[in-house]
Each structure stands twice: as structure tokens, then as C-alpha cells.
Design a protein with these regions (language model features):
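C-terminal single-pass transmembrane alpha-helix
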Residues: 349-406
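Extracellular/luminal recognition modules and glycoprotein regions
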Residues: 22-43, 355-362
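Extended, non-transmembrane interaction/recognition domains
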Residues: 47, 51, 55-358
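N-terminal hydrophobic or amphipathic segments with adjacent small-residue motifs
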Residues: 8, 15, 367-371
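N-terminal signal peptide
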Residues: 2-4, 10-33
């Protein structure tokens, strides 16, 4: 079989597999917990055929997300008074979850990139400012939900750290979206989501910088709390893509996987992942011309796990039990050499996916397959027509020679 034929078979198999691999859809249910319009807490459950994904978001204290996979009948109970005080086990499920993962926006870090490297230099602490995420004042801007998707938009317009007397103006916008089918998100960078994942889009807009810093850049530290093996580090795995159809100019997806762990038989089992494309946009247009790079740093284990989650919603669920689970941080900084620093546009974005289970793999779209097919098929058609022309011309010449020989 020729190489061209093999490629055509591969393209045909890709189209068939995309049509057969229908995702399992979930049904969304919004439940009001602790009815108080001033609260910045939201709860959703997404029911599948055999299990339920619970989502809790809280922006009081450190902004945090809890995802829990449970059996279908499992319900959530929040003791509102205790939860407001961030007390131990104020969040309880009626049955033990199959798996949980918590994400905390732990810190917003401003660093003075005096050497224009776009990398944080921890050796010089004078060039680093840590903004506590719990000192931002958040408000809910909008919440939308339909049969197979939801959207929550939060915004913080003021920073006030009472312990240090530091205040900052500017806006941090957080958009959380879930789509319960396999598809790319509708906004750039068009991340691939599944029915078991959600998207987080963060925007740092006109954040007031340190007056003594001439070359300010920003970084975000996430803290991950996971039921996996606490002794293993999370895995950071950059993956190359075949094309940049969904995110122009970007041929890579950075993937962070948690080390799944089943204590009963000590086998790797449940796990979660984060995914993002290594690009940050410097304007609302989110075009290639207004983009810069993202730098990811190795994960770090958190030593005092209880203290780390104390001022977040996650303490209300894990409590003292957090000592026995994985708690690690990852740091992401924004910018590249000679991009003008944060002050060039005073606008920076970061978009990432949080998901349960196996991360989805990018597939060639119908458009790309069509273009490849045309690119491969056209030369074959030309070769066939040329061969047919040569054959007809040769047969015609033979017929003429035979006639003359008579």
C-alpha cells in the first residue's frame, strides 16, 4: 500500500472516530445554599448517568473552587453560620466522595523585572511584592445557566491589606465556565473542555503597581489540594499540537496532572488535571499581535497544610484532614523579554482548564482534514490525469503507426 493511501486511511479513521466518540453529557442543577445575596458563594451539581460532579466556588477569603465526584444520590450540606466563619467541616457530603480536588488562588505576585528576563528572581526579595488574595474585595457580576453550560463572572476592584496598610486600585476579573460536552470553548484561546471540566479565565486590568518598581510584571500562585499521593509532585507536561487552528500562533498545551492514589490497594487511580496554552493576551482583542508568553515554575509541596488552607473555603471541607492529602503550589508568571512589561498595556490574561480524569487530546478538525485531503489529493489527481493523457496519446500514436504500416 502506498504512503498516500495510508495517509488517506488515517484521515478517514480520524473522521469516523470523531463522529463515534460522543461525549457523556451532564444535566446541571443550581441549588441555593445559605440564601444571602451578599455572599460570593455558588453551588452547582452536574448529574451524569452514574455519578455527580459537585462544584462549589467561594470568593470570601482566598478565592477557591472545590470539585467533588460522588455517587448520584449524594447531597451537599453547608452549615451556613460555621461556613461564614470558615470553620472545620462546615461543608459535608451525605456520602464520602469518590474524588475531590480543590484549587485556591493563593497569591498575586508583583515582581520588578530589572534584568528584563521575564523570570522571577527570588534572590532579591526587595523586587517582589506579595498581594494576599484574601485582601481583594470581590463581587458577583453575573451568573448564567442553561441545559449544558454555565457561566459565573466575579470581579475585585479594590485591594486592602489591613495588616500592612497597603491598598491597590485596579480590577481582577474571574470568569468561570462549564460546558457539559466535548468541544472547544467559544472564547480565545479556545481550550478543549469535556463534561468533567471547567474553564477559569483571569484578567488583571489596570492593577496599580508599586511606585518604586520600574519594570513590574505579575504572577499568580495556585494552590492545589488533591486526594492523590501526598508524597509525589504533580507532573508538568508541555505537549505539542499539530496545528494552531484554535489558538493562532500557539502550538503547545501545558498540562499539569495530579498523582492519583488509592490507599486501599496503593494503586494509581483517580486524578485531576490543569491545562493552559502558554499565552497571555495584553488587550481585549486577544490577537497574536497583542500577546505575550507565560512561564510556569516547578510545583512545591506545602509544609503546613492546615495553615495554608485556613482562610479559604477548602478548610470548611477538608479541615484537619488536609494533613493526609496532597497540597502543592504552582506559580505562573506573565511576560516575555522586551514586551514592554505590564505597564505597556496594563492588561494581562490567563486562561486554564480544571478537569477530572484523563485530559482530552486535541484532534484534527474537519477543516484541517479537508485542507490536508486537498493538499494530498490534488497532486494525485494531476498525476492520474497526466498518466491518462500519456496513455491516450501513446494509444493514439500506436493506432496511427499501425494505420500507416498498412
Amino acid at each position: 500500500m502506498s504512503q498516500v493511501s495510508l495517509i488517506y486511511l488515517f484521515l478517514l479513521f480520524s473522521i469516523i472516530s470523531m463522529n463515534l466518540a460522543g461525549p457523556i453529557k451532564r444535566t446541571l442543577h443550581y441549588e441555593e445554599k445559605c440564601n444571602n445575596t451578599n455572599w460570593t458563594t455558588m453551588y452547582l451539581r452536574a448529574d451524569g448517568l452514574n455519578n455527580t460532579l459537585h462544584y462549589i466556588w467561594d470568593f470570601g477569603g482566598k478565592p477557591s473552587i472545590l470539585m467533588a465526584l460522588t455517587s448520584l444520590p449524594t447531597t451537599l450540606n453547608i452549615t451556613c453560620e460555621d461556613f461564614a466563619l470558615k470553620k472545620n467541616h462546615s461543608i459535608v457530603f451525605s456520602d464520602n466522595p469518590i474524588y475531590t480536588i480543590g484549587i485556591v488562588i493563593n497569591k498575586i505576585i508583583e515582581f520588578n523585572d530589572v534584568n528584563n528576563t521575564a523570570v522571577i528572581n527570588y534572590a532579591n526579595t526587595k523586587n517582589i511584592n506579595v498581594l494576599k488574595s484574601e485582601s481583594f474585595v470581590w463581587s458577583r457580576k453575573s451568573f448564567t445557566m442553561n441545559g449544558d453550560s454555565f457561566g459565573l463572572n466575579m470581579e475585585a476592584n479594590f485591594y486592602n491589606d489591613t495588616t500592612t496598610n497597603i491598598t491597590r486600585r485596579g480590577s481582577i476579573k474571574a470568569s468561570l465556565k462549564g460546558y457539559y460536552f466535548l468541544e472547544h470553548t467559544d472564547s480565545i484561546p479556545h481550550m478543549l473542555h469535556t463534561e468533567n471540566s471547567m474553564l477559569v479565565d483571569l484578567i488583571l486590568d489596570k492593577i496599580e503597581t508599586n511606585e518604586t518598581f520600574s519594570s513590574s510584571r505579575f504572577a499568580i500562585e495556585l494552590m492545589i489540594v488533591d486526594g492523590g499521593n501526598p508524597d509525589k509532585l504533580m507532573i508538568i507536561d508541555p505537549k505539542k499540537n499539530l496545528d494552531d487552528e484554535h489558538t493562532p500562533g500557539i502550538f503547545e498545551v501545558v498540562e499539569v496532572r495530579t498523582p492519583g492514589f488509592n490507599r486501599s490497594n496503593e494503586t494509581q487511580q483517580n486524578c485531576a488535571y490543569l491545562q493552559w496554552r502558554p499565552v497571555s493576551y495584553l488587550s481585549t482583542s486577544r490577537s497574536i499581535s497583542s500577546s505575550t508568553e507565560i512561564v510556569q515554575y516547578p510545583p512545591f509541596k506545602v509544609n503546613d497544610r492546615v495553615a495554608a488552607i485556613k482562610n479559604s473555603m477548602l478548610y470548611g471541607y477538608y479541615g484537619q484532614d488536609v494533613k493526609d492529602v496532597l497540597v502543592q503550589t504552582i506559580l505562573i508568571s506573565f511576560g516575555s523579554k522586551d514586551d514592554g512589561f505590564y505597564k505597556s498595556t496594563n492588561y494581562t490574561t490567563w486562561t486554564f482548564i480544571i478537569g477530572y480524569g484523563t485530559p482530552p487530546d486535541e484532534q484534527l478538525s474537519y477543516l484541517v482534514i479537508l485542507i490536508i485531503s486537498i493538499g494530498l489529493g490534488l497532486p494525485v489527481v494531476i498525476m492520474f490525469l497526466a498518466a491518462l493523457y500519456a496513455y491516450i496519446r501513446n494509444m493514439s500514436k500506436r493506432h496511427t503507426d499501425t494505420y500507416l504500416n498498412r
